[in-house]
Amino acid sequence: MEGFFWKTLLVVGALTISGTSSFPHKPLTYEEAVDLAVSVYNSKSGEDSLYRLLEAVPALKWDALSESNQELNFSVKETVCQMAEERSLEECDFQEAGAVMGCTGYYFFGESPPVLVLTCKSVGNEEEQKQEEGNEEEKEVEKEEKEEDQKDQPKRVKRFKKFFKKLKNSVKKRAKKFFKKPKVIGVTFPF
């Protein structure tokens, strides 16, 4: 009978230990995860100004207890506070014409320690940029036409100059877009 007691005690102890849940990471709500991602962006981006949350896209499938990868999307805007000031973000107002960054973050909770990969890129108003570029091109073309009219050049030379000027402007635009790369930040942190 004594052997039966010890076997029963061993089984009950094993079930008790296996029944308790211990998470390898601290469960995060979506809001906490976004706040942490904004904090990581401010500390790792290398920007002079602090950025504050502008908008967080609600997560439909966020599971605070999940061990799988979790995605979050949000945008941040440049504030009047400088990084060196070490002020709370709540004290910092947005800059009037501050830069807006669209960010996508992925938490990898299955890793030990958990990993956050954050990708942010500028989301300035593309329509305004296109209009400004178009206005600049029109001004340049008008200026060139005036200069060409003043000179007595054959029409063929004028057409070539106009063509190569358009080509040059096109290359400039594409170079600007190419070198406007998003920032990618990866960090690990213990929970």
From Swiss-Prot:
Transmembrane segments: none
Descriptive protein name: Cathelicidin-related antimicrobial peptide Na_CRAMP
Compositional bias of kind Basic and acidic residues: 140-154
Principal location: secreted
UniProt-annotated location(s): Secreted; Target cell membrane
Chain residue ranges for the region called Disordered: 126-154
Family the UniProt entry places it in: Belongs to the cathelicidin family.
Pfam families on file: Cathelicidins
Record's keyword terms, sorted: Antibiotic, Antimicrobial, Cleavage on pair of basic residues, Disulfide bond, Fungicide, Membrane, Secreted, Signal, Target cell membrane, Target membrane
Signal peptide: 1-22
Domain of life: Eukaryota
Lineage start: Eukaryota, Metazoa, Chordata, Craniata, Vertebrata
UniProt cross-references to InterPro entries, sorted A to Z: Cathelicidin-like (IPR001894), Cystatin_sf (IPR046350)
GO biological process entries: defense response to bacterium; defense response to fungus; innate immune response; killing of cells of another organism
Tissue localization of expression: Expressed by the venom gland.
Summary of the function given for this chain in its UniProt record: Potent antimicrobial peptide against most of Gram-negative bacteria, some Gram-positive bacteria (Bacillus) and some fungi. Adopts an amphipathic alpha helical conformation, that may allow to partition into the target membrane. No hemolytic and cytotoxic activities have been observed on mammalian cells.
Propeptide residue intervals: 23-161
GO terms for cellular component: extracellular space; membrane; other organism cell membrane
Cystine residue pairs: C81-C92, C103-C120
